[in-house]
Amino acid sequence: MLRLDPGEGRIATTRSFEVWEGGGEYNVARGLKRCFGMDAAVVTALADNAVGRLVQDLIYQGGVDQSHLKWVKFDGVGRTVRNGLNFTERGFGVRAAAGCSDRGHTAISQLKPGDIDWEKIFGAEGARWFHTGGIFCALSETTPLVAREAMEVARKHGAVISYDLNYRESLWKSIGGQAKAVAVNRGLAPLVDVMIGNEED
């Protein structure tokens, strides 16, 4: 996902944004690589256009393995597939951070079981830890199924599974709200070794 940062300004009034790569799960992988020097990879899907290639370049700069990027043919306008955008205002003083997601019809939201070769990742390549969370699962009706598929294969190969509840009302609103988030999270919980959350999740 491409994150657009207006600096100290507001989304509604700024005239420029700085761009970063981002995403709840990706940020963990980047932190492990940049802060601790650990090998980390991201599994995601991007529309194959200039914005997708920008995200790829930013991931490269972050030092995260991108060999599991799934490229989806772009239709030229974004009717069928797009790359996710997240506009994020910084919080400081009494002003809370604020975000505006633009993530409908994204390549990652269209992932479905069978699209990713999890056996290769956890079997042949020997990945030892899998991390995902509520943001990915909120993107569509199929993303929780992809998370479950990955967890089942990871568990079979003895990898540790972590899950960040990371509840975002704006992402869950169109597919059932908090009740849907609770149902999805409870369904995945038995497969999780490390669950991360707080009283807001």
Positions of predicted regions on the chain:
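Conserved beta-alpha-beta core of the PfkB/ribokinase-like small-molecule kinase fold
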Residues: 129-201
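Positively charged, low-complexity intrinsically disordered leader regions
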Residues: 1-11
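Conserved N-terminal subdomain of the carbohydrate kinase-like
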Residues: 39-134
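Short secondary-structure boundary/capping elements
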Residues: 20-27, 113, 180
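Short beta-strand segments at enzyme active-site cores
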Residues: 37, 41-44, 161-165
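Short pre-catalytic strand/loop immediately N-terminal to key active-site residues, enriched for Gly-Thr
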Residues: 12-22
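Alpha-helix C-terminal capping segments
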Residues: 20, 27-41, 61
